Amino acid sequence: MEMVRRRLTVVGVGLVACLGCVSFGPNSILSYLYYDYGPEATLEALESAEINPENLALANLEKAMVLTELGRYEESLDALETAALRLDADAETAAVVSSRGYGPWLPEYHERVLAKTLAMANLMALYDTVGAAAAADLALEEIAAIGCGECEFGFTRLLAALAYGGAGRFSDGLGALEGLEAEGRPAALVGEVRRRLERGVAGFQPEGLAPPPVESERFVVAILLLGRGPYKEPATLDLGPGHTIRWSRWVPREPQTIAWAVMDLDEPVRSAEFTDVEEVAVAGLDLRRRRVIAGDESPSSPKKRDARHWTSMPASLQVVAVELPSESDAVDLV
């Protein structure tokens, strides 16, 4: 399993020094470092800066994304675990507001799902089949708990199917694929995974998801993190006459050209299953808005409007499978 990140970068004039505390808004130095100078500069800033206690969970998610991009998967898993433990504690103290005017950062729905998805991807990259399948359980449980029918987490679900297949849990893999072959969705890769899972359920026990030893059917599966995700800005939510609360909204970036290609390869590329981060972010926040209006969920209400978010989130997450030529064991994605 390979993971590739392609950022749309802007060349700056010199690297600014990151002093004091790291901030996590749309125009923060962290976002600037990550998208203009890459993961190494971002990691250095995160490890050298003083992080305010209410931002520790978010800082560890940012660190996890950077470490994954650098191929340091075990360290990324450690950062994700630290973030999860902090979020559990912060959820109990969300009403507490610090002297800076913020309470502890709590993730939006899609950020919760994608944190668990990142853990699953790291374990797959480490070839920990049992651990990846257990992480798939947690990711799908999170999707079910959120209950957002409009949130298309196809990337997470296909990745979960691959993880289950690798662990020999073929029926669970088929369950993860439910609905992914609907009309209008890219089905070639999903169909290929489904056929292999069905073969496993029927009693053919391949090693993970490996196909029969036919030389012309050698694939590499890659995870692509493409572009720059939406940013969050302060807003208000109208709850009725004379009653508004502090809220936020997701704003898309300027139109981006998000593309990739396989270098020097004429072999077919299986269609990708993907998640559009802006779509799931907007759909998830709209669901939370409806729940707050209905009284089913309590909003956090800090003194200041809150635009903190996971700034290194990509615009699109994709899974692709590339058929390898017989003389090669790798391909270059650009």
Residue ranges and their predicted role:
Residues 17-20:
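C-terminal motif of bacterial Sec signal peptides marking the signal peptidase cleavage site
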Residues 28, 62, 66-69, 111-118, ...:
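"A position-specific structural signal for the A-helix of alpha-solenoid helical repeats
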Residues 31-46, 77-96, 126-141:
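Helix-turn-helix repeat elements of alpha-solenoid scaffolds
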Residues 300-334:
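C-terminal soluble interaction/assembly domains
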Residues 55-57, 86-95, 144-152, 181-204:
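Boundary/linker segments of alpha-helical solenoid repeat arrays
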Residues 78-88, 137-138, 162-186:
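TPR/TPR-like (Sel1-like) alpha-helical repeat modules
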Residues 22-24:
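Bacterial signal peptide processing site
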